[in-house]
Amino acid sequence: MLRKIILFLVFLQFIGYQVFSQVSVKDSAIVVPMIYATYAYQLPGGDLAKRFGGNSSIGGGFMIKTRSNWLFAAEGNYIFGSNIKNGDSLLKNISTPDGYVINANGYYSEIGFGETGFDVLGKFGKLFPVLSPNPNSGPLIMIGGGFLQDKIRIHDGDNTAPEVHGDYKKGYDRLNNGWILSGTVGYLYLSDSRLINFFVGFEFMQSWTKYRRARNFDTGLHDNSSLSSQFYGAKVKWFIPLYKRKPKDFYLY
């Protein structure tokens, strides 16, 4: 699957280079619409840090850079991780004294835990063309806001433990969602050749979420408390510019 994604991105990059190769970013600041893929490694803070360790996120988005180097973007990310704190205690009420869950065949189940979620954000900011090879590259700063959802992923390796399937699983996953704000600083590089276009930087996110399940099965209680959490991440993006053109003439904004 990963190989197919990489090949697809390389194909799009090649097509973009062939179709739009007469547009130059080295002479002046131009309007640059771009699609991109992104990866981040994040460390949690606040309430979610009590449950999860570091996680990763992969996603994509669309960004447009104006001639005056203002930036506007829409982005979505899938969040995943395997670092769960005290995960085994969630199933204590359906486990043996040794901490195992008995499956439908009478054997021990291989239950695993992880983190899964997603975020969707709108962002805007400014690029500063200093310490850069052309007027369309340089340090940038962006802020944004959107929606975040996060929960515990419970995986039954043999798929034979009905205690953690379907609606029963929902009683243990601590689903929470709500609003999120983000701030990003880093460096955007758009090459003169149009083949290498990337961003590297750091992102901070502050979320305000709320538990959404009717009842937690491990406690037997309804929990509608709110969470205040942070994410501190290192982020990279790979861009594919989409310059406009006419049949014979290319626009230089």
Residue ranges and their predicted role:
Residues G183, Y189-Y253:
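Predominantly the C-terminal beta-signal and adjacent terminal strand-loop region
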Residues Q42-P44, I79-N83, L127-P129, G146-I152, ...:
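Structural signature of outer-membrane beta-barrel domains
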Residues Q22-V31, S68-N69, V130-G138, L190-F198, ...:
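Short loop/turn motifs that connect adjacent beta-strands in outer-membrane beta-barrel proteins
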Residues A37, G60-I64, G76, V120-K126, ...:
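Residues on the lipid-exposed face of transmembrane beta-strands in outer-membrane beta-barrel proteins
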Residues G46-R51, I84-T116, D150-G178, T209-G233:
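Extracellular/periplasm-exposed beta-strand and loop segments of Gram-negative cell-envelope proteins
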Residues V31, G54-I58, G114-V120, S137, ...:
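Residues that define the transmembrane beta-barrel architecture of outer-membrane proteins
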Residues K4-F14:
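Sec-dependent N-terminal signal peptides
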Residues Q22-L71, K237, P241, Y253:
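Short glycine/proline- and aromatic-enriched beta-strand/turn motifs that initiate or cap beta-hairpins
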